[in-house]
Amino acid sequence: MKPISERRCGKDGVSAGIARKFGSNGFRVVLLSRTETSLQRSLEDLRQVHIESYGITADASDPDPIKAAFTQIENLYGITDVLVYNAAHIAPGDALSLTEQQLIDDLKVNTVGALTSAQQVIPDMVERKQGTLFFTGGGIALNPNPLYASLSIGKAAVRSLALSLAETLGPHGIYVGQVLIADHVQRGTFYDPDRIADVYWELYTNRDRKEYLFKE
């Protein structure tokens, strides 16, 4: 059975780039997306380049659908070898305009969903003493953007989560890495999703860095 790489579909192209990279290297890809339309579009693109891929819809802001999705994945496709969490809620606004509820709602996607997703695959990885967890971060985790206060907070939080997991899971043979993307992802630029995907593959292969700042 081929290894399984799971990820959450995104609109920025990072998910698609990673899926193509891992899929072209023998991974069977399972996508999780909030909407069926986005999911089917992503699957169609992958299958056109002959990548074995499947998909399930789940809302990253709600733990119950996430847990149900991972149960379904294990039942249908087997144990997860690589998890990539790429979901984010990107909403403009400075800290003065940010409400408590907005921050809570955004953190459900930007951070809590990452923890919930990881918790679904960690027990099997610990038992097998192998596995990889990836989290897509942002340069704003290091240098907050005042115009995107909530996202800056969320990316800082998920960075801390990833670093904490790396320390905790490393002794169990599990690699945890993250890529901090410092600008807008756009095809044909330095921040092309396929260039970013190459970094994920490099980290997966070498397993020698806890984080990589992708910055021009």
Model region roles, listed by residue range:
Residues 2-3, 79-80, 94, 125-137, ...:
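Active-site loop of short-chain dehydrogenase/reductase
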Residues 109-127:
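Amphipathic alpha-helical dimer-interface segment in Rossmann-like NAD(P)H-dependent oxidoreductases
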Residues 27-41:
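Conserved glycine-rich Rossmann-like NAD(P)H-binding loop of the short-chain dehydrogenase/reductase
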Residues 89, 96-115, 158:
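Catalytic Tyr-X3-Lys loop
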Residues 13, 132-157, 163, 170, ...:
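Catalytic loop of short-chain dehydrogenase/reductase
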Residues 1-29:
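Canonical Rossmann dinucleotide-binding motif of NAD(H)/NADP(H)-dependent dehydrogenases/reductases
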Residues 163, 170-216:
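C-terminal helical subdomain
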